[in-house]
Amino acid sequence: MEAGEGKEPVPKQRQVLIFFVLLGIAQASCQPRHYSVAEETESGSFVANLLKDLGLEIGELAVRGARVVSKGKKMHLQFDRQTGDLLLNEKLDREELCGPTEPCVLPFQVLLENPLQFFQAELRIRDINDHSPVFLDKEILLKIPESITPGTTFLIERAQDLDVGTNSLQNYTISPNFHFHLNLQDSLDGIILPQLVLNRALDREEQPEIRLTLTALDGGSPPRSGTALVRIEVVDINDNVPEFAKLLYEVQIPEDSPVGSQVAIVSARDLDIGTNGEISYAFSQASEDIRKTFRLSAKSGELLLRQKLDFESIQTYTVNIQATDGGGLSGTCVVFVQVMDLNDNPPELTMSTLINQIPENLQDTLIAVFSVSDPDSGDNGRMVCSIQDDLPFFLKPSVENFYTLVISTALDRETRSEYNITITVTDFGTPRLKTEHNITVLVSDVNDNAPAFTQTSYTLFVRENNSPALHIGSVSATDRDSGTNAQVTYSLLPPQDPHLPLASLVSINADNGHLFALQSLDYEALQAFEFRVGAADRGSPALSSEALVRVLVLDANDNSPFVLYPLQNGSAPCTELVPRAAEPGYLVTKVVAVDGDSGQNAWLSYQLLKATEPGLFGVWAHNGEVRTARLLSERDAAKHRLVVLVKDNGEPPRSATATLHVLLVDGFSQPYLPLPEAAPAQAQADLLTVYLVVALASVSSLFLFSVLLFVAVRLCRRSRAASVGRCSVPEGPFPGHLVDVSGTGTLSQSYQYEVCLTGGSGTNEFKFLKPIIPNFVAQGAERVSEANPSFRKSFEFS
């Protein structure tokens, strides 16, 4: 994109920037302020205080980045932001900077930012009398024929003084003599030319040579002077002066002409003969620059280059050439040499302001201010600036070849953190020359990215009975920012369930996101829980994100089967009555057991471990029902003791035993026959009856209370279903010898017992129903129930 050529419509968002740029241009276009200083003033000397002219207070100078800029790479001035003083950066030599030009003015600008303003000013360098008049030739030779009549004027070599104004050359004097006096003539360009005027005729025989001292004086205070010896040789008569073919020669020569190139050939002729007709050529009134640049052949009049030309330094030369014959007569001509400019200078770029580091997300922000220049002329000095097209920057022309580099669209460090910008300045010469200036802009980070977790949710598995401080898993989040904006800190967020004691369950390492269990977990108390973790960066303001963590507690076989019926609490043993007329398969009783574990650890199997008479009774492995294995006979003992083993399917398996007492009776309507070891007293029979009734009533009441409590707990849990996790239970058919007691044990069936008890005066018969325990429906492969602290040892199974 090229600045200075066709411009696209300015977007609305840049109106503010353009306003300040135009404001700066408007101010820059005002009449410049003038300041002056004498040349050769010491570096650091005070020039002027700019506060009043700038219309600023001292405190605003640093804020607005006030600085002095000027064309070229050399900075002659410096600006003190603390005081507003304009100071010299170095000694200034007026003759070196401006030569004979008067006045000697150095333009400069004061650049202000925020908003951008240019303050135009000029520094005039006053001349001091630091140069004396100097004659380039310390001896001036004049050959004057003795026939010259009085009143004849002779032009002599003038002195040169680099100072200007009153300090320049003002007067000449000649030493006292009888033959000549000095006449001063002003030329058209204001130069004083000394001339010798003959007062009386010369006589070579009387005085063949006259020596005079010519003194040049300047107008300084005190004046300076320079002298030269004027040696006059009186020669014989020569009545024809050399005449040039042209009084003015105009030539053009390219500035890249090689040394030794011919510039021009001048030619003069003399009508005299002999030595009076022999012509020699020499420079007349030639400055030091002319003598350094050109060489003149005394015999041929050929003007040659002595050194390379430079259009940017000197564009024209006026060379005075004098032709002198052997008799001392001379004539002059002028060779006007015009140096032709070539495109031999590439453009120059001077950076005034450069901001190397820019925060991201900024737009229409000033990056750099620079100026361009080309010492060539015409199209060779016209320039255009450009940068790469694929960058979010654009160039804005300002005033007097000043440009600003501005951000066009907001930068994003995460997309690109560094830009290498090449500013190309190209002139319109042939061939086109260009200069490239590279700058690097670093995009600094702004906290515009929140940490992002690698997963939106994490599922962690922990086996119960773990050791405290166990590492159970990790969460991880990354931040696309850099530095402190990318440093992530992890934390636990308050749980949604106010009853979940999260602070006592888990902790998180704030630096790396490692999660630790603070206590030993109990599956039977808490199967699963979930919580949220936060990740926050250290930016300002800090950004954060969160993720869900689900912790599933895996069951361990840490609970042995618990026999609910018959009670094994050490009280009076439970006695089951079986009629001797019972058929094989007759249901004697049912051993009811539960296991606090889940899944395979809660699958229970039953087997008959001991029996008074093996083969008479059997236990169904899958439901714990005790049934008769064959017909009973009179030979079978009336009292039997059975030991039933209840075993789970864990690894290693855990077990419990239940002891049953079975009493064989002939019929429920007949009197009760005491066991052999029982006392025949009627009081003992009555006591046994009371024990049986109390035991059965207690078991029934216990089951009823358990069912009611379980239903209440389930209803309470459903009200908190939003925070309930999921847990898997074994699927597929159970093994044939196992029964699933998850939530129900073996109490899923209702059954009856008929009991015949002998009273004191007759036979009483009654029946009662066992309480029905409802089936607990499995919650699915992913459902996990929350722990209820008040129901830890109750019928809570998954």
Curated annotation (Swiss-Prot):
Cytoplasmic topological intervals: 714-798
Extracellular side: 31-692
Gene: PCDHB2
Species: Pan troglodytes
Residues in Cadherin domain copies: 37-135, 136-244, 249-349, 354-453, 458-563, 570-673
Bilayer topology: Single-pass type I membrane protein
UniProt keyword Magnesium present: no
UniProt signal peptide: 1-30
Residues bearing carbohydrate: N171, N420, N438, N569
Localization annotation: Cell membrane
Function: Potential calcium-dependent cell-adhesion protein. May be involved in the establishment and maintenance of specific neuronal connections in the brain.
Gene Ontology MF term list: calcium ion binding
Name of this protein: Protocadherin beta-2
TM spans (from-to): 693-713
Organism domain of life: Eukaryota
Classification via Pfam families: Cadherin, Cadherin_2, Cadherin_C_2
CC per GO annotation: plasma membrane
